[in-house]
Curated annotation (Swiss-Prot):
The keyword Ribonucleoprotein applies. This is Large ribosomal subunit protein uL2. Residues 201-278 are annotated as: Disordered. GO terms for cellular component: large ribosomal subunit. SMART domains: Ribosomal_L2 (SM01383), Ribosomal_L2_C (SM01382). Pfam families: Ribosomal_L2 (PF00181), Ribosomal_L2_C (PF03947). PROSITE patterns: RIBOSOMAL_L2 (PS00467). HAMAP family: Ribosomal_uL2_B. One of the primary rRNA binding proteins. Required for association of the 30S and 50S subunits to form the 70S ribosome, for tRNA binding and peptide bond formation. It has been suggested to have peptidyltransferase activity; this is somewhat controversial. Makes several contacts with the 16S rRNA in the 70S ribosome. Belongs to the universal ribosomal protein uL2 family. Keywords: Ribonucleoprotein, Ribosomal protein, RNA-binding, rRNA-binding. Residues 210-221 have a biased composition (Basic residues).
Length: 278
C-alpha cells in the first residue's frame, strides 16, 4: 500500500503522511472473532502507573488473531484484508474449507481470493503458508516464528518485519533476526512464509500531537525538565544537561545499558546483535 500526503491547508496537514488504506475492508470485524478491550491507562490492579505516558485514545475492539496456525492440512481462502488498531500490521480473514473462520497476520503480497494452508509437513513456499522450519528452504524469508513448538508465533509480527533462515544444524534452524542477531530455534517450530504487511508503517508522520493522543499516547516528559523530587536529572538553574550519565526515574542506567540476564537461553544465541557487523 502507498503513502498518502495532503494539501498543506494547515501546518498539521502539511506534515501529515499516512498509509493509504483504501484497499482494506471498510466494515466491522467478525463478531465471533472479537473481544472487548478495556483501556488500562498504564495502571495496574492497584491503580498505580506502571507504564508512563499512556492513557486516553480511541476505544478499541480486540481481534483474536491466530498466531498458532495449528489447523493443519485444511486449505483456507482469504476473504479480505482488514485494519487492526491493536497492531501495526494488517490482518487477513481466512475462511477454511470446513467453514471455520480465523484472523491471521497478513503477509506482503497476500490478496483476497488467495489460498493459504498450514501443515506439519512441507507445503508450497508462498506468502501465508505455515510449516515447520525444518521444511522451509534455506534463504527463505519468514515471519510469525515460534520460539517454542506449539506456543504460537512470537518473533517478526510487526509491520514489515521478517526473519531469514540462514542454515540448519542438528535439528535446529539458524535464523537471522532484523536486529542482526543470529539465533537457534528448534526445527519443529512453525513459521509463516513471507514478510509482514504494511512495510510503509515506518514512514508515517502523525503531523500533530493530537493524532498521538488518539492512539492513547500521552506526552513523553524528559527528566531534565522536571524537579529534583521527580527525577534524578531534575532541577538546576536554567537549562542543564542532567549532570550525570542518563538514568531512569528510579536511578537505573538507561540509553544503551545492557539488561539481558536470561542465561538459560544464551546457548541459543549464535551471534549477538551487539557484535560489530563484519
Amino acid at each position: 500500500m502507498a503513502l498518502k500526503n495532503f494539501n498543506p491547508t494547515t501546518p498539521s496537514q502539511r506534515q501529515l503522511v499516512i498509509v493509504d488504506r483504501s484497499g482494506l475492508y471498510k466494515g466491522k470485524p467478525v463478531k465471533s472473532l472479537t473481544e472487548g478491550l478495556s483501556s488500562k491507562g498504564g495502571r495496574n490492579n492497584l491503580g498505580r502507573i506502571t507504564v508512563r505516558f499512556q492513557g486516553g485514545g480511541h476505544k478499541r475492539t480486540y481481534r483474536l488473531v491466530d498466531f498458532k496456525r495449528r489447523k493443519f492440512d485444511v486449505e483456507g481462502t482469504v476473504e479480505r484484508l482488514e485494519y487492526d488498531p491493536n497492531r501495526t500490521a494488517f490482518i487477513a480473514l481466512i475462511t477454511y474449507a470446513d467453514g471455520e473462520q480465523a484472523y491471521i497476520l497478513a503477509p506482503q503480497r497476500l490478496a483476497a481470493g488467495d489460498k493459504v494452508i498450514a501443515s506439519d509437513k512441507a507445503v508450497d513456499v508462498k506468502p501465508g503458508n505455515a510449516m515447520p522450519l525444518q521444511y522451509v528452504p534455506v534463504g527463505s524469508i519468514v515471519h510469525n516464528v515460534e520460539l517454542k513448538p506449539g506456543k504460537g508465533g512470537q518473533v517478526a509480527r510487526s509491520a514489515g518485519a521478517y526473519v531469514q533462515l540462514v542454515g540448519r544444524d542438528a535439528g535446529m534452524a539458524i535464523l537471522r533476526l532484523s536486529s542482526g542477531e543470529q539465533r537457534l530455534v528448534h526445527g519443529t517450530c512453525l513459521a509463516t512464509v513471507g514478510a509482514v504487511s504494511n512495510s510503509d508503517h515506518g514512514n508515517i508522520n502523525d503531523g500533530k500531537a493530537g493524532r498521538s493522543r488518539w492512539r492513547g499516547k500521552r506526552p513523553h516528559v524528559r527528566g531534565v525538565v522536571m524537579n529534583p523530587v521527580d527525577h534524578p536529572h531534575g532541577g538546576g538553574e536554567g537549562r542543564t544537561s542532567g549532570g550525570r550519565h542518563p538514568v531512569s526515574p528510579w536511578g537505573k542506567p538507561t540509553k544503551g545499558k545492557r539488561t539481558r540476564s536470561n542465561k538459560s537461553t544464551d546457548k541459543f544465541i549464535m551471534r549477538s546483535r551487539h557484535q560489530k557487523k563484519k
